[in-house]
Amino acid sequence: LEDSYLKTCSGSVVEIGEDKSIILDKSIFYPTSGGQPGDKGFLQFGIGRCEIVTTRKGENGKIILVPLNHDYLPKVGDTVEQFIDWETRYKHMRVHSALHLLSVVIPLPVTGGSISDIKGRLDFNMPESLSDKEELESHLNELIAGGYKITNSWITDEELAAQPGLVKTMSVKPPIGSGRVRLVRIGSDDQQIDLQPCGGTHVASTSEIGSMRFGKIEKKGKQNRRVNIHFVD
């Protein structure tokens, strides 16, 4: 998504799938990807509305909207107004940005991750458990409170291949294949906190995340530890 803060937008129905899923010519719904859940929301058309329970990726970059029921759907060619569940989306944005900071606080290879509207977690290639949990939590919240800008830029697939150090995740491939890759930068050129490829949604400043606390640190196999973080409020 070019603008994570876009809450509503019009679009035209280009396809209704056999499973009654809906594809629009342009969509503000984020599909399940990279550990981030797909958006919920609704489509307004005519005198009715269609609830969307999740969003997923289809072939060739299609964004597939999954309706709650099949009784009242738009038709191909209809113009609809899209409304995402902004409260949930914004929490996903805050958690996703917090996880990028967590990968700075714990500078180890990431083997997995997950985002919800109340917490997030990263799995690290970490044979030994953390001994300084409180110190790391304090460091995370210092970065959040720093109010660092979060911005996007683009490089080509070839440029990313030439800079493998940008990729922190071992289990999830960066969003390549379209010819260009989005980089998410935290901080500025002269005070860069983090830079990594990511197709997800993020807040515009770390200060929007809010205070986080460390939750359970779980052992997941010989080499892996799962670190959970939660909103304080």
Residue spans for each PLM region:
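Active-/binding-site microenvironments in catalytic and ligand-binding cores
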Residues: 1-233
